[in-house]
From Swiss-Prot:
It comes from Xenopus tropicalis. Ca(2+) 3 binds at residues 159, 161, 163, 168. InterPro entries: Calbindin_Ca-bind, EF-hand-dom_pair, EF_Hand_1_Ca_BS, EF_hand_dom, EFh_SCGN. Residues 8-43, 52-88, 100-135, 144-179, 192-227, 235-271 form the EF-hand domain. One of its GO terms (molecular function) is calcium ion binding. This is Secretagogin.
Length: 271
């Protein structure tokens, strides 16, 4: 990236993000994008900034950094564009493969929601970041860890209550679209519903034990409830989880067997 941005730190990056994501929707797009590239040209010392010049620079950078090719900048894409590598703590959240399964997401959630409050506090987020640095074999001072924790809270804690909910963490980890959205159960025949059930159960039965347990139940409940209520809280999830277990866990072993879930859904699974 050009030298004008090489001295940026996480707090300055936050300031730029909040300035140009004016509608607070998690993207810089449309008019915001034009204003950002105009600002970029000024920072680089350009003279006589014209709409054509802004468009040229925009095309150049978007082709290099707009990984999703959706014509807008996500926070990770902007970080890659303007933060020096040693300050780009958002690189920690890059994964070799996309996070496309709510089971793995819920495993992370349960690990760091240490007090089972249904939220990730600043202290719990700090522990999460510290573990990420260790996993990436990177050294970090306590002060820097505090700065990154504070920046993450300001970036993702939209209601400013000092803690992250399920949706905030889903944004941080770039959780992919709800797996259940691809299925139209109401419009299907009985055979199609049985086939879909097999696919759905296999997706959430990550451990391949023939039963959903722990984060597998959590992931299924999260996706199922978000079909009707797009933003559920950790507290809501725990309530819905207990309702599902009360209804489906016939033998009371704390798991949902494949046959138990099929019975709940009014299906007879394939043997």
């Amino acid at each position: 990236m050009d030298s004008a941005f090489l001295k940026l730190d996480a707090a300055e990056f936050l300031e730029i993000w909040q300035r140009f994501d004016a509608d607070d929707n998690g993207y810089i797009e449309g008019k915001e994008l034009d204003e950002f590239f105009c600002h970029l040209l000024k920072k680089l010392g350009a003279n006589a900034i014209t709409a054509e010049k802004v468009q040229r620079v925009k095309d150049r950078f978007m082709s290099a950094y707009d990984v999703t090719a959706d014509g807008r900048l996500q926070i990770q894409e902007l970080a890659n564009m303007i933060l020096p590598e040693d300050e780009n703590f958002l690189l920690l959240f890059r994964r070799e493969t996309p996070l496309d399964n709510s089971v793995e997401f819920m495993r992370i959630w349960r690990k760091y929601d240490e007090d089972s409050s249904g939220f990730i506090s600043a202290v719990e987020l700090r522990n999460f970041l510290q573990d990420l640095f260790l996993q990436h074999k990177k050294q970090i001072t306590g002060d820097k860890l505090d700065e990154y924790t504070d920046t993450m809270m300001k970036l993702f804690n939209k209601n400013k209550d000092g803690r992250l909910d399920l949706n905030d963490l889903a944004k941080i980890l770039a959780l992919q679209e709800n797996f259940l959205l691809q299925f139209k159960m109401d419009a299907s025949s009985q055979d199609e519903r049985k086939r879909d059930f097999e696919t759905i159960f296999a997706h959430y039965d990550v451990s391949k034990t023939g039963a959903l347990e722990g984060p597998e139940v959590d992931g299924f409940v999260k996706d199922m409830m978000e079909l009707v209520k797009p933003s559920i809280s950790g507290v809501d999830l725990d309530k819905f989880r207990q309702i599902l277990l009360n209804h489906c866990d016939v033998n009371k072993d704390g798991k949902i067997q494949k046959s138990e879930l099929a019975l709940c859904l009014g299906l007879k699974p394939h043997p």
